[in-house]
Amino acid sequence: MLCEDGQWVKNKKSFKNQGKKQGNMSPEEKLQLIKRNTQEIITEEELIKLLKTKKKPTVYLGTAATGRPHIGYLVWAIKMSDFLKAGFHVKVLLADLHGALDGTPWPLLEKRYKYYEKVIPLLFKAIGTDIKELEIVKGSDFQMSKKYYFDMLKFSTEVSINDCKRAAAEVVKFGDNPKLCGLIYPIMQALDEVYLKADIQYGGVDQRKILMFAREFLPKVGYKQRIEVMTPLIPGLIGAKMSASDPKSKIDLADDEKDVNDKIKNAYCEQGIVQDNGVLAFMKYVIMVVKQDNGEKLIIERPEKFGGNLEFNSYEEIEEAYTSKKLHPLDLKNAAAKEINKLLKPFRDEKAEIEKLSNEAYP
C-alpha cells in the first residue's frame, strides 16, 4: 500500500504511442507504455499474455490514509495514467483501514480519508489525464464484509508471524514493540487484489516484499496470483527517500510558490552528481514525462552572459548536460521550481477547501 476531472493531453510523438487512441494500440505498444520508468514487473511474460487476451484489464494502486500526500505521489499518478492510456480500468484504493493499521489515530481516520479523497483526483488533473476509466474506492466499503473477514482469517492460517513481519517491514512502522495490526496489514493488501478484481497491483519498489507475499500465499487460499508492477522510489530533497513524515525531504501539495522555491533552492543538488539527487529524479520521473507526452521541450532560462537559454527534448539530454557540468545546479533548480509550481496549480485553485480539510486531518 503506498505510504476529477482531468482533460486528455495529446502527445506529439515524443513517446510514440501516446498520440494513438487506446483502441488502436497494439499489445506491444501497450507493453512499452506500461514498462516506461518501471523498475520491476513480476512477471513480464504474464503481462504480455494479459495484454493479448483481455480487452480491458484492471490495475489497482492502494494508498494508505497516513501522512499528507506530497509531490512524490505524482510518480504513481503518471504510471496510473500510462495504464489508463493503455486501455486499463484503473482503481485507486484509498485505504482508510490500512491507515489505522499503520498508526493513523482512529478519531482522525475519516478526516484523513476526506483529505485524500479531495487531493488524489487533483494529481491526475495536474498532469492532464483523462480519468473517465478511473475508479476511487474506499477500503472500508468492502473490507468490513463477512466474506472478506472470513478470507482474512483463512489467510492467517497459512502464514506465520515471520512471513507477515518480513512482508511489511519496509512499509509498516513496527518500532521496538510491534503491534499485531502491522501483521494484519500485508494479509489485507494481498486480499485487496482479489476483492478489487485486479489483474495487476502497482506500487513502489518498497512494496516488493508485500507483493511477493501476495503471489506466494494467495494460491494457498484458493485465489490466483496477480501481476505486480513496481516503480523506483525517488530521492527526497535532502538526498534520502521522499517521505510524508519529513517536511524537509518533500514538497507538500499545498505548498505555495515561495515554499516551493525555497525548498528547491535548499535541496541537495551537487554539481555533476546524479545519485541521490531529488531534483534530477523529479525531472526524470515527472517533469520530462509530462513534457514529452505533451510534445513539449523543457526550456531552462539563463542570461545571455551565461550562455543563454537551454532547450531539452528528453531527460537523457538533461542528465548528460548536468554530468558534464554544462548545466549548473542553480539553473536546474530554477527550472524545476518553475515546472513544479505549474503542476501545483490545480491544488492552489482549491486552496481554501484543501487547507480546511488539511487542518482537520492533521491538527
Regions found by a protein language model. Give the residues of each.
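Arg/Lys-rich, low-complexity, intrinsically disordered basic segments
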Residues: 1-19
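Divalent-metal (Mg2+/Mn2+/Ca2+)-assisted nucleotide/phosphate chemistry catalytic cores
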Residues: 107-230
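N-terminal catalytic cores of NTP/NDP-binding nucleotidyl/phosphoryl-transfer enzymes
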Residues: 38-103, 201-210, 214
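Conserved nucleotide- and phosphate/pyrophosphate-binding catalytic cores
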Residues: 190, 196, 208-363
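Short functional linear segments
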Residues: 23-43
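Short secondary-structure boundary/capping segments
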Residues: 76, 107-109, 246, 283
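Divalent metal-coordination and catalytic microenvironments
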Residues: 70, 120, 239
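Short connector loops at secondary-structure junctions
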Residues: 95-107, 231-237
